[in-house]
Amino acid sequence: MSETKTNLLDLDRDAMRAFFVELGEKPFRADQVMKWIYHFGCDDFDQMNNVNKVLRERLKAIAEIRAPEVSREQRSSDGTIKWALQVGGQEVETVYIPEEDRATLCVSSQVGCALECKFCSTAQQGFNRNLKVSEIIGQVWRAAKIVGGKRPITNVVMMGMGEPLLNLANVVPAMRLMMDDFGYGISKRRVTISTSGVVPALDMLGDQIDVALAISLHAPNDKLRSEIMPINDKYNIEEFLAGVRRYLGKSNANGGRVTVEYVLLDHINDDMQHAHELAKVLKDTPSKINLIPFNPFPGNPYGKPSNSRIDRFSKVLMEYGFTVIVRKTRGDDIDAACGQLVGEVIDRTKRTMKNRMQQDGISVKMV
């Protein structure tokens, strides 16, 4: 990529209009070009036949449309596709999950992750950097181009590699493009951001954009959560859920409820007492609960619970009146299931990041 060229995938609609106004063009040119990029998957200015030739030539000189390239593709027996995408010498993974009534894309927000959750393969790879807007929306662009068809992607979940709320400055514009009518036109109820509990950033998020929220809870008490999710030492369950309720108060995309993600680790957090504890801790936070049977990966001490343990846990929660879904494992034969995304983090700097988080607090850049 040329350093002197602007990658148009880095610009949401406001930024794109400002770009064209700076060129002396009318703002509607931005809308025209966005339709070519996102509706038609076009990355060649010469094909944009409703843009005059003089402007096309100028755009070729100063701009580009460059999405991450696929370095590897794996297709699961259940239809799931996992792509490893090149992002500046590193790799991130993106997963496409087709179902009868929808097609969901699981998108990464960082190269690696700094939060070190003990049950997640991504966390074991270390942390390198935040992804740029073009590298986030570019995952959607690349997947839509490969899959093809009229509505190749109906849902996007920011549940790939990384903690999205530690990259708000790039994640928010990318999500705007997902929902923009000149982008992918996906409903805000079908764009989901997931967080492990970066509470100050959750408050910022609610002031910036309205999307569906999922939270990675994974334990019903602070002692256990801190053991498996170190971020709990900084923002405990009570603080986290208070932040969630504040977000729900600002949001129309969630129907008043948050999705609680709870990975079931055999004989760690899946006892009946844990289910009762979870119901009690969530009593003031309107929730639907996604139970995720653990997906094993090499070198990890945790196991997947038996079906009977999963059923018992689920039934306890339903007795309290919660909507409970046991997530169907998809793509586990190609390591594309929840918690298995790795990519290739070449430069591991997670210790530096962890130290900085402990010393200075978790820093959040905002748009």
Swiss-Prot record:
<comment type="similarity">
    <text>Belongs to the radical SAM superfamily. RlmN family.</text>
</comment>
<comment type="function">
    <text>Specifically methylates position 2 of adenine 2503 in 23S rRNA and position 2 of adenine 37 in tRNAs. m2A2503 modification seems to play a crucial role in the proofreading step occurring at the peptidyl transferase center and thus would serve to optimize ribosomal fidelity.</text>
</comment>
<keyword id="KW-0963">Cytoplasm</keyword>
<dbReference type="Pfam" id="PF21016">
    <property type="entry name" value="RlmN_N"/>
</dbReference>
<keyword id="KW-1015">Disulfide bond</keyword>
<dbReference type="GO" id="GO:0002935">
    <property type="term" value="F:tRNA (adenine(37)-C2)-methyltransferase activity"/>
</dbReference>
<dbReference type="GO" id="GO:0000049">
    <property type="term" value="F:tRNA binding"/>
</dbReference>
<feature type="binding site">
    <location>
        <position position="295"/>
    </location>
    <ligand>
        <name>S-adenosyl-L-methionine</name>
    </ligand>
</feature>
<dbReference type="GO" id="GO:0030488">
    <property type="term" value="P:tRNA methylation"/>
</dbReference>
<keyword id="KW-0949">S-adenosyl-L-methionine</keyword>
<dbReference type="InterPro" id="IPR007197">
    <property type="entry name" value="rSAM"/>
</dbReference>
<dbReference type="GO" id="GO:0019843">
    <property type="term" value="F:rRNA binding"/>
</dbReference>
<dbReference type="InterPro" id="IPR013785">
    <property type="entry name" value="Aldolase_TIM"/>
</dbReference>
<keyword id="KW-0489">Methyltransferase</keyword>
<feature type="active site" description="S-methylcysteine intermediate">
    <location>
        <position position="338"/>
    </location>
</feature>
<feature type="domain" description="Radical SAM core">
    <location>
        <begin position="99"/>
        <end position="333"/>
    </location>
</feature>
<dbReference type="InterPro" id="IPR040072">
    <property type="entry name" value="Methyltransferase_A"/>
</dbReference>
<keyword id="KW-0479">Metal-binding</keyword>
<dbReference type="InterPro" id="IPR027492">
    <property type="entry name" value="RNA_MTrfase_RlmN"/>
</dbReference>
<feature type="binding site">
    <location>
        <position position="120"/>
    </location>
    <ligand>
        <name>[4Fe-4S] cluster</name>
    </ligand>
</feature>
<protein>
    <recommendedName>
        <fullName>Dual-specificity RNA methyltransferase RlmN</fullName>
        <ecNumber>2.1.1.192</ecNumber>
    </recommendedName>
</protein>
<feature type="binding site">
    <location>
        <begin position="216"/>
        <end position="218"/>
    </location>
    <ligand>
        <name>S-adenosyl-L-methionine</name>
    </ligand>
</feature>
<dbReference type="GO" id="GO:0070475">
    <property type="term" value="P:rRNA base methylation"/>
</dbReference>
<feature type="binding site">
    <location>
        <begin position="162"/>
        <end position="163"/>
    </location>
    <ligand>
        <name>S-adenosyl-L-methionine</name>
    </ligand>
</feature>
<keyword id="KW-0411">Iron-sulfur</keyword>
<keyword id="KW-0698">rRNA processing</keyword>
<keyword id="KW-0819">tRNA processing</keyword>
<feature type="binding site">
    <location>
        <position position="113"/>
    </location>
    <ligand>
        <name>[4Fe-4S] cluster</name>
    </ligand>
</feature>
<dbReference type="GO" id="GO:0046872">
    <property type="term" value="F:metal ion binding"/>
</dbReference>
<feature type="disulfide bond" description="(transient)">
    <location>
        <begin position="106"/>
        <end position="338"/>
    </location>
</feature>
<dbReference type="GO" id="GO:0051539">
    <property type="term" value="F:4 iron, 4 sulfur cluster binding"/>
</dbReference>
<keyword id="KW-0808">Transferase</keyword>
<feature type="active site" description="Proton acceptor">
    <location>
        <position position="93"/>
    </location>
</feature>
<dbReference type="InterPro" id="IPR004383">
    <property type="entry name" value="rRNA_lsu_MTrfase_RlmN/Cfr"/>
</dbReference>
<dbReference type="GO" id="GO:0005737">
    <property type="term" value="C:cytoplasm"/>
</dbReference>
<keyword id="KW-0004">4Fe-4S</keyword>
<feature type="binding site">
    <location>
        <position position="117"/>
    </location>
    <ligand>
        <name>[4Fe-4S] cluster</name>
    </ligand>
</feature>
<feature type="binding site">
    <location>
        <position position="194"/>
    </location>
    <ligand>
        <name>S-adenosyl-L-methionine</name>
    </ligand>
</feature>
<dbReference type="Pfam" id="PF04055">
    <property type="entry name" value="Radical_SAM"/>
</dbReference>
<dbReference type="InterPro" id="IPR048641">
    <property type="entry name" value="RlmN_N"/>
</dbReference>
<dbReference type="GO" id="GO:0070040">
    <property type="term" value="F:rRNA (adenine(2503)-C2-)-methyltransferase activity"/>
</dbReference>
<keyword id="KW-0408">Iron</keyword>
